[in-house]
Amino acid sequence: MALDIAMKFYLRSPLRRDRVECRITQSNEPLRPCIQTTDKTLLSELSNQENKVKKRVSFADSRGLALTMVKVYSDFDDELEIPFNISELIDNIVNLTTVEKEHFVLDFVQPSADYLDFRNRLKADSVCLENCMLKDKALVGTVKVKNLAFQKCVKIRITFDSWQTYTDYDCQYVKDSYGGSDKDTFSFDVSLPDSIQSNARLEFAVCFDCEGRIFWDSNKGLNYRIVRHGHRIPYDPVCVSVDQYGSPRCSYGIFPELPTYSGFDKLGPYY
């Protein structure tokens, strides 16, 4: 006997993960490999370079050539003409050498180069040349004197003809910016004549007149000399003396690296 049976089937809903995987489209392109292979063209180029012939060095004598080349120079029949500008330059150099020998220089060491000696001379003589230089055909410098009284007169007595005649030039007072010092400073500027005989001696000394009392600084009796460059006597750079306390003083000779007034005649006054 036939029976009719009715049955219900239920399908579960797909999981969320399954739905996501279904949505992802599968790519047909293959992934790029991480290992790179060498290009075929590069390999072929390397092989071609290896097959090339290596360079070789050959000498000239192996090919029948000379190793040296000799050139013979003969004297010119005509004298070589020097361009005018070069000959003029040579003449100027010769003239500069002559002028260098003829120009005047100081023939003494700057008194203040040895400060202790300068101080002792000022203490003993009440006057001392401090520094001096030649500038533009003029003699300029400074003098230190003791402040013995208010009225003072300082002069430079100079001769241009070996003391056959002489001239006195007044020095100008230099105001002390600090004040209250027991020493005064005077400056001088003496113009040199245009023509001076080659054998004439140029010498000068410093005179200090204070209320009728006369004091002289004559460079210890030698006077301060000005000579031509060619007649200058070189000085021994090593000079040592001992002051009253027994200490050596010579920063110019023993310690030349210390700052002194050595070579001051080429630099200029500091005031």
UniProtKB/Swiss-Prot annotation:
<protein>
    <recommendedName>
        <fullName>Protein phosphatase 1 regulatory subunit 3B-B</fullName>
    </recommendedName>
</protein>
<dbReference type="GO" id="GO:0005977">
    <property type="term" value="P:glycogen metabolic process"/>
</dbReference>
<dbReference type="GO" id="GO:0008157">
    <property type="term" value="F:protein phosphatase 1 binding"/>
</dbReference>
<feature type="short sequence motif" description="PP1-binding motif">
    <location>
        <begin position="56"/>
        <end position="59"/>
    </location>
</feature>
<dbReference type="GO" id="GO:0000164">
    <property type="term" value="C:protein phosphatase type 1 complex"/>
</dbReference>
<comment type="subunit">
    <text>Interacts with glycogen, PPP1CC catalytic subunit of PP1 and PYGL. Associates with glycogen particles. Forms complexes with debranching enzyme, glycogen phosphorylase, glycogen synthase and phosphorylase kinase which is necessary for its regulation of PP1 activity.</text>
</comment>
<keyword id="KW-0321">Glycogen metabolism</keyword>
<dbReference type="Pfam" id="PF03370">
    <property type="entry name" value="CBM_21"/>
</dbReference>
<dbReference type="InterPro" id="IPR038175">
    <property type="entry name" value="CBM21_dom_sf"/>
</dbReference>
<feature type="domain" description="CBM21">
    <location>
        <begin position="119"/>
        <end position="227"/>
    </location>
</feature>
<comment type="function">
    <text>Acts as a glycogen-targeting subunit for phosphatase PP1. Facilitates interaction of the PP1 with enzymes of the glycogen metabolism and regulates its activity. Suppresses the rate at which PP1 dephosphorylates (inactivates) glycogen phosphorylase and enhances the rate at which it activates glycogen synthase and therefore limits glycogen breakdown.</text>
</comment>
<dbReference type="GO" id="GO:0005979">
    <property type="term" value="P:regulation of glycogen biosynthetic process"/>
</dbReference>
<keyword id="KW-0119">Carbohydrate metabolism</keyword>
<dbReference type="InterPro" id="IPR050782">
    <property type="entry name" value="PP1_regulatory_subunit_3"/>
</dbReference>
<dbReference type="GO" id="GO:2001069">
    <property type="term" value="F:glycogen binding"/>
</dbReference>
<dbReference type="InterPro" id="IPR017434">
    <property type="entry name" value="Pase-1_reg-su_3B/C/D_met"/>
</dbReference>
<dbReference type="InterPro" id="IPR005036">
    <property type="entry name" value="CBM21_dom"/>
</dbReference>
